[in-house]
């Protein structure tokens, strides 16, 4: 089941993407 990430989760996800690290909360 895929849960749409909240705004905070999207920002968190983006920060991890910039660091080049996989995010465990949402798949980027």
Swiss-Prot record:
Potent inhibitor of fibrinogen interaction with platelet receptors expressed on glycoprotein IIb-IIIa complex. May prevent blood from clotting during either feeding and/or storage of ingested blood. GO terms for biological process: cell adhesion; regulation of blood coagulation. It comes from the Eukaryota. This is Ornatin-D. Its main location: secreted. GO terms for cellular component: extracellular region. Belongs to the ornatin family. It is found in: Secreted. Keywords: Cell adhesion, Secreted.
């Amino acid at each position: 089941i895929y849960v749409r990430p909240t705004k905070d989760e999207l920002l968190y996800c983006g920060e991890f993407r910039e660091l080049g690290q996989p995010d465990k909360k949402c798949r980027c």
